[in-house]
């Protein structure tokens, strides 16, 4: 049996004319977090991702939020996806697949992950409210598009039921954390879970 070393960590920095982001991720953490994105709603959602996924996340971001939250949200998704990919390396010995149903009061979402090196996002979670606090609800999809592209994951997000936009998005972030934690669990075999021998 192959034992995956519990030291899957990464650190990514990204600076553009629009954002300046530093992120540290520990996939074998305990849900510890220190998050300051400048976007209060996104802080809340990423905290939930960290806690419910047992992932340690340190994140500081400065962006052009005087314009809107788009660049900051998308670029954090880019950096988080890169951090996941870096921490996992060749993805050898992990479960690779995971699916989670997660409720939040009346909201129920399904998150399915394949850490396949084939980036793809299916997103079907309509939120009626255009704003969640001051946060544009359409940015949730842009965030997960960036994460999936940079992490090299196939990611399906579906809302089964839901009325309250905050509940729907909260369930998505919690569910993503839980699904990711399951997909990276040790499988007990060497190499990638693929008939090709690699991903």
UniProtKB/Swiss-Prot annotation:
Main location: cytoplasm
Subcellular localization: Cytoplasm
Name of the protein: Imidazoleglycerol-phosphate dehydratase
Alphabetical list of SUPFAM superfamilies matching this protein: Ribosomal protein S5 domain 2-like
Signal peptide region: none
Family membership: Belongs to the imidazoleglycerol-phosphate dehydratase family.
Alphabetized UniProt keyword annotations: Amino-acid biosynthesis, Cytoplasm, Histidine biosynthesis, Lyase
EC number: 4.2.1.19
Pathway(s) per entry: Amino-acid biosynthesis; L-histidine biosynthesis; L-histidine from 5-phospho-alpha-D-ribose 1-diphosphate: step 6/9
First-level EC class: lyase
GO biological process: L-histidine biosynthetic process
Catalytic activity: D-erythro-1-(imidazol-4-yl)glycerol 3-phosphate = 3-(imidazol-4-yl)-2-oxopropyl phosphate + H2O
PROSITE patterns: IGP_DEHYDRATASE_1, IGP_DEHYDRATASE_2
Gene: hisB
GO molecular function: imidazoleglycerol-phosphate dehydratase activity
Species name: Desulfotalea psychrophila (strain LSv54 / DSM 12343)
GO CC annotation: cytoplasm
Superkingdom per UniProt: Bacteria
